[in-house]
């Protein structure tokens, strides 16, 4: 462009530089970082949960294995202890054994302790006598018990078998009825014989007011493994 004096004037417009949106870039960066942190946190939580589940499963497994070993050890210990007790009985020197969970003068067999007492008592008195020792009158519910008791006493002894009336069924103290063919039951047809005693492998009904010796039974505890010979 030429001015009045003949000089050429250049009209140059300076371009303004584009402004960078600092706020927008900063916001995007924080979002990325927040997403990364969220993913890391979720991953840590999932990892901790998985670790916790694995830890519980491992503990349960080890506990189960330990219980199985303990149960197996107890079974072996029980059998061996009862073998030792039986041998002492066969030798006629029965004094019990330290491995037995039963008290002195109680016999250890199966899962129970058996007490043979020479006290002349009525059936009700015998029942109370056993109760006072945290036991019950003997219940015979399998053939092994029949043979075990038969081999260890030849005396008349009360057991926990009775009935309310002569026309009612015989029941054990826990309310269960006698099993068929478990033992020979000698019924003589006389009325009011509502209590039973055991003698030489057979069950006999008799009057509850009669006085006889008795047999008590209670659950055995754990075999004392550390006392085995």
From Swiss-Prot:
Record: glycosylation sites: 68, 120, 134
UniProt cross-references to Pfam families, sorted A to Z: Lectin_C (PF00059)
Residue ranges constituting the C-type lectin domain according to the UniProt record: 109-217
Residues bearing the modification Phosphotyrosine: 7
Membrane topology term: Single-pass type II membrane protein
Outcome of swapping residue 150 to A: Substantial reduction in rhodocytin binding
One annotated GO molecular function: transmembrane signaling receptor activity
Consequence of changing residue 192 to A: Significant reduction in rhodocytin binding
Keyword Cell membrane on entry: no
Annotated keywords: Disulfide bond, Glycoprotein, Host-virus interaction, Lectin, Membrane, Phosphoprotein, Receptor, Signal-anchor, Transmembrane, Transmembrane helix
GO terms for biological process, alphabetical: cell surface receptor signaling pathway; defense response; platelet formation; signal transduction
TM helices/strands, residue ranges: 34-54
Protein location: Membrane
SUPFAM superfamilies assigned to the protein according to its UniProt record, in alphabetical order: C-type lectin-like
GO cellular component: cell surface; plasma membrane
Tissue: Expressed preferentially in the liver. Also expressed in immune cells of myeloid origin and on the surface of platelets.
Extracellular topological segments: 55-229
Cytoplasmic side: 1-33
Disulfide bonds: 102-113, 130-216, 195-208
Free-text description of this protein's post-translational modifications in UniProt: Glycosylated. Phosphorylated on tyrosine residue in response to rhodocytin binding.
Annotated motif ITAM, positions: 7-10
General function of this protein: C-type lectin-like receptor that functions as a platelet receptor for the lymphatic endothelial marker, PDPN. After ligand activation, signals via sequential activation of SRC and SYK tyrosine kinases leading to activation of PLCG2. (Microbial infection) Acts as a receptor for the platelet-aggregating snake venom protein rhodocytin. Rhodocytin binding leads to tyrosine phosphorylation and this promotes the binding of spleen tyrosine kinase (SYK) and initiation of downstream tyrosine phosphorylation events and activation of PLCG2.
PANTHER family noted in UniProt: C-TYPE LECTIN DOMAIN FAMILY 1 MEMBER B (PTHR46490:SF2), C-TYPE LECTIN DOMAIN FAMILY 12 MEMBER A-RELATED (PTHR46490)
Subunit structure, interactors included: Homodimer. Interacts (via cytoplasmic domain) with RACK1; promotes CLEC1B ubiquitination and proteasome-mediated degradation. Interacts (dimer) with SYK (via SH2 domains). Interacts with PDPN; the interaction is independent of CLEC1B glycosylation and activates CLEC1B.
UniProt name for this protein: C-type lectin domain family 1 member B
Source species: Homo sapiens
Lineage, broadest ranks: Eukaryota, Metazoa, Chordata, Craniata, Vertebrata
